[in-house]
Regions:
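A generic structural signal for short, non-catalytic loop/turn and secondary-structure boundary residues
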Residues: 1-3, 141-142
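Glycine-rich phosphate- or other oxyanion-binding loops that anchor nucleotides, phosphorylated ligands
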Residues: 114-174
């Protein structure tokens, strides 16, 4: 039986990532310390999977997009650091379970077919909204899988219902 250990809402300004700020990170020192503290707590909990919702992933008015590629990768090229790259293993089983539970609850959720991704110009690249916290977490937690979810424009009740689907899927898993 799996369990959700904690939840965090983290800021994600790229300037807090070492090598990107070029001195500007001093202006965000309190943010850096807060993100480091959260990352240390996550590292102590040792979750096998991190479920992360990012406001910069492709989002829809009526659909929760759950990235479904086997490997979730991204970099900071848009912020002048193309060699700062990250790659994570997607927990596809948990992602699929979340999507299935959501559908049963009447919330449209899941991945997208390659043709849909092309149609909408969607890339499976992990965006900075996820990468910034993950680059701090990765320093504290060596091994984990990832479920990456967009932040959709759904009414509050549907979002709450979707959260309950995440909870149910995790409980039924070994995560």
């Amino acid at each position: 039986m799996g369990k959700i250990m904690n939840g965090y809402i983290l800021p994600h300004p790229p300037i807090i990532v070492p090598g990107i700020g070029h001195g500007r990170e001093r202006d965000a020192n309190a943010t850096i310390e807060a993100v480091k503290k959260a990352a240390k707590e996550i590292g102590k909990d040792k979750p096998t999977t991190i479920i992360l919702s990012t406001p910069h992933a492709p989002c829809f008015r009526d659909y929760v997009y759950i990235m479904d590629s086997g490997t979730l990768a991204g970099d900071f090229a848009a912020f002048g650091s193309p060699n700062l790259k990250f790659s994570f293993t997607n927990n596809k089983d948990l992602a699929a379970s979340i999507a299935e539970k959501a559908k049963l609850a009447g919330v449209s959720a899941g991945g997208l077919a390659e043709s849909q991704k092309r149609q909408y110009g969607i890339s499976d690249r992990v965006d900075h909204g996820a990468l910034v916290p993950l680059c701090f977490i990765e320093k504290e937690l060596e091994e984990f899988r990832l479920v990456l979810i967009s932040t959709p424009f759904l009414p509050f009740r549907e979002l709450y219902g979707f959260g309950k689907c995440i909870q149910e899927a995790v409980r039924e898993s070994d995560e």
